[in-house]
Structures are given as structure tokens and as C-alpha cells.
Amino acid sequence: MARHGFAGTSTEAIVRAAGITRGALYYQFVDKQDLFRCVCEALVKRLAARLWTETMASIEREEDELRVGFLKLLDYCADPDVRQILLVDGPAVLGMEEWRRLQEPSTMGLLRHALGHLVEAGRMPADQVEPMAHLLFGAMTQASIALGEAIDPEHSRRVYRESLERLLDGLEGR
């Protein structure tokens, strides 16, 4: 689906690539949109696990988790498959509410964890973790939508990265 997008991928192409029958496809999934929802869920979970692993492996101080994680997430948005599936087709096929709902559990958990380190370091009051997690989730959601729609994704990713650095500088008191 990533190469041709949701609309450009027929169920015939899906069953052929998977080596299954159309009956087997519809036994597991109500329709192509249901299959796509499952693809999105799996991709979000895979990216969240990858983000956690790569972020934890690359930070020296726990309070750097938020910055490093956010910047890695922006880099993931540049991947053509992620861009097509999650950023272009995801909102269009599933609708914004469902698309957001798929991402929220893993993203909010990662944000709360990272913000907790800022609390531990004395750089944020504990009662601001939840509102800040929601604000940052909204900012990242909007940034990812913009990156998905970008005519020049590489330029847009660079500009959003610089803007995110400014936002995090302010949050971290730099």
C-alpha cells in the first residue's frame, strides 16, 4: 500500500502480494479500510518501540529524552512508507479522529515518561506533565500532518526540526 497509496492499491494486488485468497482477506477484515486500520496500528506500535529503543540508546541524561525522541520522530516522518501510510493516507482514509486515536496511547505514554524526567530534574512542575503532554501531542500531530502534505518533505522536515528545537529550548529553559 505504501508505494501506490491506499486508493492506488487494489484488493487484488493485496491478496496477490500476500499469497492469499480474497475470501481469506475478507474473513479476517471487514473491508480494505479495516485492513488499512490494522496496518496503521501495527506501524504505530512498531515506530513507538523503535523510538523508545533508539532514544534510550542515544541519550546520556534522562532529561534529554524528550528532545532526542521528538527529533527522531521527525526523522521517521521522512521515511516514504511512514509518510504515505501514516501521514498522507492515515488521516484521509481513517478520518482525523480515528487517526489521532490510533496514535494517542503510545505517543502520550512516551511523552509522559519523557516529561517526568524534566520534573525529576526540577525543570517542570509535576502538575504540568499532563497538559504539556497534550500540547506537545497536538504540536507533533499538526507537524506530522504538515510534513505529510509537504511538496518538499526534506526542506519541511528541516524547518520543522529547527522550530521544534526552539520550542524545546523554551520548555527546557535554555
Describe each PLM feature range.
Residues 13, 34, 38, 68, ...:
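Alpha-helical elements of Rossmann-like donor-binding domains used by nucleotide-donor carbohydrate transfer enzymes
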Residues 75-79, 108, 112-113, 117, ...:
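Amphipathic C-terminal alpha-helical segment
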Residues 38, 52-81, 132-136:
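Hydrophobic alpha-helical connector segments
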Residues 3-7, 80, 121-122:
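Short coil/turn segments at alpha/beta junctions that flank glycine-rich nucleotide-binding fingerprints
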Residues 51, 55, 59, 94, ...:
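Short amphipathic alpha-helical interaction patches enriched in hydrophobic/aromatic residues
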Residues 2-34, 38:
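Helix-turn-helix
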Residues 45-52, 64, 68, 96-121, ...:
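Amphipathic alpha-helical packing segments from all-alpha helical-bundle domains
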Residues 68, 74-113, 145, 149:
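Short secondary-structure transition hinges
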